[in-house]
Amino acid sequence: MSRRHAAEKREVLPDAKFGDRVLTKFMNNLMIDGKKSVAERIVYNAFDRVESKIKRAPVEVFHEALDNVKPSVEVRSRRVGGATYQVPVEVRPERREALAIRWLITAARGRNENTMEERLAGELLDAVQSRGTAVKKREDTHKMAEANKAFSHYRW
């Protein structure tokens, strides 16, 4: 690993259909083996399903679902004198977004519907209504942070 300087962050281009950068990040995370066109097709078809189910703009629904999954606090392990404490820390905005995207995709992949489009649409609809696996993951993370509040003075 180079010690000279950190690699600069590359700008993510907005997606073709909706012109949304966050949606592009979502597609990039969903993509397997560099098959971006497949990821795009899955997302756009899932959006069509969402739009037909609840008559709202799919990008609006996507952002609302993402907001419902974003964690505000998480726990980090901190070793103090031979003991490891789970210290609650606030989550940076970029990481919030990244975690929400990752959790939504993982939850969608774990569902029982037939196609990935159906799974993704189902998970997005659940997340908008504050249910589903991704939202549960966020709640669990918050509970963990709440339970370990006593160790918050170990924050760094």
Swiss-Prot record:
**Gene Ontology, cellular component aspect:** small ribosomal subunit
InterPro entries annotated for this entry? Ribosomal_uS7, Ribosomal_uS7_bac/org-type, Ribosomal_uS7_CS, Ribosomal_uS7_dom, Ribosomal_uS7_dom_sf
Q: Which GO terms describe its molecular function?
A: rRNA binding; structural constituent of ribosome; tRNA binding
What keywords sit in the KW lines?
A: Ribonucleoprotein, Ribosomal protein, RNA-binding, rRNA-binding, tRNA-binding
Superkingdom, natural source: Bacteria
HAMAP family named in the record: Ribosomal_uS7_B
Query: What's the subunit arrangement here?
Result: Part of the 30S ribosomal subunit. Contacts proteins S9 and S11.
Q: What role does it play?
A: One of the primary rRNA binding proteins, it binds directly to 16S rRNA where it nucleates assembly of the head domain of the 30S subunit. Is located at the subunit interface close to the decoding center, probably blocks exit of the E-site tRNA.
This protein is called what? Small ribosomal subunit protein uS7
